[in-house]
A protein has these predicted regions:
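Tandem repeat scaffolds
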Residues: 4, 8-114
Length: 114
């Protein structure tokens, strides 16, 4: 059974859907950890987002502009980056380059190295 991305009712998710990265970052700074797993981020421009300690597990980033984002402290298990723009993205060190290439090229879900 295929997983379908959610359109999350969370206010922080809605800010990203509306393209308000600045307000997202301001509100996120007041929180310890943000849970946005299983969400649909397809076709969004997320440049400038503070992604530290954000749970993006099982999210769809199809054709999403992620250029320059630091994802090194984000949870990305099962996320798909099909055709995403990833120039300058810092991925978690536990996700291998081949995993990222497969996800961007073929839409596979990323797995962490054990």
């Amino acid at each position: 059974m295929a997983l379908k991305p959610l359109t999350h009712p969370d206010e922080l998710y809605q800010l990203l859907r509306e393209g308000d990265v600045k307000e997202f970052n301001l509100r996120k700074a007041q929180l310890d950890r943000i849970k946005l797993n299983d969400c649909d981020f397809r076709y969004l421009d997320l440049r400038g987002i503070d992604a530290q300690r954000v749970d993006f597990r099982n999210c769809y980033f199809h054709n999403t502009d992620l250029r320059g984002i630091d994802l090194s402290q984000a949870s990305l298990e099962g996320a798909s980056f099909n055709s995403a723009r990833i120039s300058g993205v810092l991925f978690p060190k536990d996700i291998g380059a081949q995993e990222i290439i497969l996800s961007v090229t073929h839409g596979t879900r990323v797995r962490y190295l054990k």
